[in-house]
Each structure stands twice: as C-alpha cells, then as structure tokens.
Amino acid sequence: MPRILFTVPPFPVFIAAGEGVFKKGETHVKRVFSVFDLIYVKQGTLYITENETSFSVEGGEYILLSPGLEHYGTKGSDEATSYYWLHFDEHRYEFTAKGGSNWSELQQEKGSFEELARYGLALPRKGKVQRPQFMAQQFEKLIDYSAENSDLPLRKQILFEELMLHLQKEAFQIPSAKERVAWEAARYLQEHYKEKTTIKDLSLALHYHQDYVSRCMQQVLGVTPAQYTNRVRMTEAKRLLSSTNDKMGVIAETVGMEDPTYFSKLFKQIEGISPIEYRKIVSRKVQ
C-alpha cells in the first residue's frame, strides 16, 4: 500500500476533528482540501475516489486524503455509514510505494547539541485499525477538546500525535526478537565506533550468527552494520567540526578512520557537503 512519509520534528499540526453519518445511498461530496483529511469508518462502507483512484473503506479502516488532490464519493453507501474525520496540516511530505514492514524510511538521524534528531513518520494511505477501541477513544477526546470552551487546547495536539504514532506502529510492526538484536548491535557499534569493528566482532559480542545480525539491522534500521558505524562516525565528526579547530586528519583519527581523504569523501557522501564546507556553515551560524 502506498504511504505518505513525513519528517519530524516538527510534527504535523492538528486542526479539527468531528464525526458524521452517510445515510444509505448518500455519497461524499466532491472537493479539494488544502490540508490532510483522515477519515476513520466506524460502521458501514465508504466508497471514495481520490485523484482517479477508487477505494472502499470498510468499518475499522481509515483513509488519509491528501491536500491538493480532488476526492469525491464513488457511489452511495450500501447502508448507514458512520465515521470520524480529522484535519491536520503539514507541507513537508512525500508519497512512497516502498515496502510494508521495513523501517528503513523511518531511520533516525542522530542529532547533536546544535541539530535536532530527525525521524520518519509514515502512514499507509489506507489501513486497517487493529485497536478500534483506542481509535474511538482518541477521536472522542479530540472532539470533546475541540469544544468552544475547552480549557485544554494543547491536549488536542498531544492526542493527535498519539493517534498518528499508534497508526504508524500498527502499520510497521517488527518482530521483537529482530528489533532487540538490531538495537543491541546499534548500541555496541555506538560504543565501539572508534575501533576497527568487523561483523565477526559484532557477532561474537552479541552471540548471534553474522548473517542474522546483519539481516536484523537491515530489516529494522535499514542499514548494514558498516553503514551504521559510518553514520555514528559522521555524527561525531560534525560535533568535532563545530566545537573544535582540529584538522581533518585529527578528526578522522578521532572517529576511527585512518585515511583523511576517505573520511572527507565519506562525509560528503553521507552529509551532502565536505567537512570544510560544514565547518564554514556552522561557524557562520555561531557568529
């Protein structure tokens, strides 16, 4: 199922929520929104078309309609169809058709003392809710807090974020054993990135076969052990570039890389700019 991928922070902004009912034979009106429209069907079936693609959204399912795309009822409801709706705003997003249970697109970008960590928030454009009671509770609270005299305005945003994260968690479940191995490997590499750690070293430290460790990291984190180590090294390199006057050779050696030329090449490959350019940009920000 195609997905919509957001990069957070900042998180998408909640606007409003409500509920409604389509009577038997009634269709959804034709319109184009400037914001996202999340519709969760409680009972019945909603027949809706977005951008010339038709969907049947049954009870316990949701559909996420995108800004700028025309949507309308494909045909009338077969029975009374009750639903919740939620509008939120976010301009930075992309459509992707990749994978279903692979977390590679959700990979965390580690932050530093000057830069925020970045995460992926990805939702299928249509999905089945596994915990309908939780969804109903969140929507009811959002509707209550949307009342005119609500004294908890910030709670709406928190409830909305909880709802979105829950939908993502349901859509991207990872076997706990693989997840545990992947994060154990990640922690080990974070602690030993300055060393010449091989996949064999990692395997011996975790007491798992080399292929299994590598496979777990790729499925859960979307990177190989070597790629993860290099990301950790580049994060530390950025910290050193922004907080010290050390030469490239010293920084390369500090993060566990003997060849300054290869260090610079890898830094540009991962970060998009050279270490020298990065230092200049950071220096201008400080000034």
From Swiss-Prot:
Domain of life according to the entry: Bacteria
InterPro entries named in the record: AraC-bd, Homeodomain-like_sf, HTH-like, HTH_AraC, HTH_AraC-typ_CS
Pfam families: AraC_binding, HTH_18
Domain HTH araC/xylS-type: 183-281
Key words, A-Z: DNA-binding, Transcription, Transcription regulation
Protein's UniProt keywords contain Repeat: no
Gene3D superfamilies on file: Homeodomain-like
An example molecular function term from Gene Ontology annotations: DNA-binding transcription factor activity
DNA-binding region ranges: 200-221, 248-271
Keyword presence, Oxidoreductase: no
Cited SMART domains: HTH_ARAC (SM00342)
Protein name stated in the entry: Uncharacterized HTH-type transcriptional regulator YisR
Organism of origin: Bacillus subtilis (strain 168)
Lineage start: Bacteria, Bacillati, Bacillota, Bacilli, Bacillales
